[in-house]
Regions:
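An acidic, glycine-rich, mixed-charge low-complexity segment common to nucleic-acid enzymes
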Residues: 1-66
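A short, basic-hydrophobic beta/loop patch
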Residues: 2-11, 83-123
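Short alpha-helix boundary/capping and kink motifs at helix termini
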Residues: 42-98, 110-111
Length: 123
């Protein structure tokens, strides 16, 4: 049995994560609203949630997690490199949570241990 690696995290998301989030958010939102959401994310306080809860709220099926290639992120975890916190957006009540940036990190963390507490910003 492979030993579980401890996941290390940066204190704040990296600057490039916000750009990636804005690019992704332009798919479900108009560009102007995507920019507004990213500005909100930049101002948001850090939060912490269990990996399994984030994935459940995002309605991500396990088969989808297994389909992605997140070996790069798993290698970073194994090497002890700190990961950037993820960026989350709550759409309308009842809609699935949007992982605006950090989906592959989320998959790698969940695969390592679904109970891991994940730092994130959420709006």
């Amino acid at each position: 049995m492979k030993k579980k690696s401890a996941v290390k995290w940066l204190d704040e998301p990296a600057g490039k994560d916000y750009s990636a989030a804005e690019s992704f958010l332009q798919l479900p939102y108009a560009p102007k609203l995507a920019r507004v959401r990213v500005k909100e994310l930049k101002r948001a306080q850090m939060s912490r949630y269990a990996a399994k809860d984030i994935l459940r709220a995002s309605a991500t099926p396990i088969s989808e997690i297994q389909a992605f290639d997140w070996t790069k992120q798993q290698d970073e975890i194994d090497k002890g490199a700190p990961l950037s916190p993820i960026l989350l957006v709550r759409p309308e009540p009842g809609d699935r949570l949007i992982v605006a940036d950090g989906f592959h990190r989320m998959c790698a963390v969940f695969a390592a241990d679904q109970e891991i507490i994940v730092p994130c910003k959420i709006v």
